[in-house]
């Protein structure tokens, strides 16, 4: 009877919330938080030549911990009632920054997203010695349907790369000011941009691939899509991460094959092979295949759709079928995707922004298909690069359903 009561109480107890930046026990090795506490400040950036003023959240390595942040967002979906959602964090508002300069990572969310929608990456990377700036692109809410929705989509297409480059320019300028509270901790010679969905659309252009303005999806925009705002080279930009990038798929294809060869910085593409928004084969994989001047990787989640870039579903959305498809995946656990992204993004950025060959070696997997990898050791633990046949950093029994392809620049 006591055992039955104990089990009943356990099952009835609420799960303790965990900040998305803290990986679960099944996470691969480099997903773990770094040694630094995390601070958080907010700033604004004005896009040159426009009236756009962007709110930007900046996470950074801090000297000390403290009361952690709870992120809040008011959602107004296209259908159903509005609601408020919360996400736990580990960052401490206005904490004193740690000494030194750190590489800059800019995060750009998907259409209708918000600056705190990818805190699983932002806080995690800041704990590892990066200054992370996440843009609120202010797309508005309510989806892309109807005339108002089409205006919002057009605005996102026009502004994504501009916004990213404006934030890079503003924070790089602050890095040159020795007394700037955040700028003096930014290493503007080592910059990466991470974009998810529509953010990925901008990232490919920011990385150096000019849009094909004659493309059917772009030609109606006319002179509004000014290539002069999409610079061919950005000082300090060393790498991009494109998560489920939009804009490669017909009929919305925004690049020519020749234009994609302008993407010359190292790139990490992340996608689900069942993506029904950006489309895997004719969209994301097509972008990857034709970015031939980039030293590039493609991480694929088999049986995953489009939601491979954001935080796990907020608890408040779990009983809302109209919201589930905006956050959750039908097969994969979202926190599992987050942890794998944390692992590989850390390996990639450490390799190209910090010159960390040891962490960079975690990209050198022995098999493209995770399912044919063989566990080389007798017991549990993380596989090392010295253990041939298994992806380094993954644990026994926890390597399934992935592909990691690499193609050198040519």
Each predicted region: which residue ranges?
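Domain-level recognition of soluble alpha/beta enzyme cores
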Residues: 20-107, 127
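Alpha/beta-hydrolase-fold serine-hydrolase catalytic core, especially in secreted/extracellular enzymes
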Residues: 294, 303-306, 311-410
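Short substrate-entry loop that stabilizes the transition state in hydrolases
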Residues: 65, 88-102, 107-145, 249-250, ...
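The feature captures the conserved acid-bearing segment of alpha/beta-hydrolase catalytic domains
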Residues: 96, 221-301
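Gly/Ala-rich beta-loop-alpha elbow adjacent to hydrolase catalytic centers
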Residues: 195, 199, 203
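Residue in the alpha/beta-hydrolase core beta-strand immediately N-terminal to the catalytic nucleophile
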Residues: 190-192
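Alpha/beta-hydrolase active-site loop
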Residues: 152-188, 205
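Active-site rim elements
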Residues: 150-155, 251-256, 326-339
